[in-house]
Amino acid sequence: MKIMIVTDAWEPQVNGVVRTLKSTARELTALGHRVELVTPLEFRTVPCPTYPEIRLSILPYRRLRERLDAFEPHALHIATEGPLGLAARRYARARKLPFTTAYHTRFPEYVQARFGVPLAATYRFLRWFHGASLAVMAPTPVVKDDLERFGFDNVVLWTRGVDLDIFRPIESKVLNTARAGSYL
């Protein structure tokens, strides 16, 4: 299957979104899928106000359309709600191409704390953005419940799992209760 993932979050950022997408692309490729990522590295960008590490693509639609047309994906995943995400959503809607989206961070709460924008306004935008997707993927049951509480009706869990190359639990050892009692 040919899968295209579109994201506004990418290197040089080091965060959970970037790590999740890299891991997802690696695992999908290992399963035999052909995966292409569209990231801000391919576009002219400007720094995000108040968060310059995030680069926002400038007018990405034409180049993104060319990438999508050339790749002809069987599946389109829109990972973020920024300029690239908006352009990918526009493309998919215009062509009646099904797509999925993801909700990675508590963006409305961040915008409210940083700029005083009411939660309801940001969640209204996010319902519009994600509402057209086949599914909006949430990382935890708590986030899924929060989105549903704010009126999202197409939320599914997309848990991250554990990287077994990094995390290897040691064998559990039987506790010697006779000896442990001497420490109490």
Predicted regions and their residues:
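Short N-terminal targeting/anchoring amphipathic segment
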Residues: 64-85, 95-100
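Nucleotide-sugar donor phosphate/pyrophosphate-binding loop at the beta->alpha transition
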Residues: 98-100, 107-128, 137-138, 164
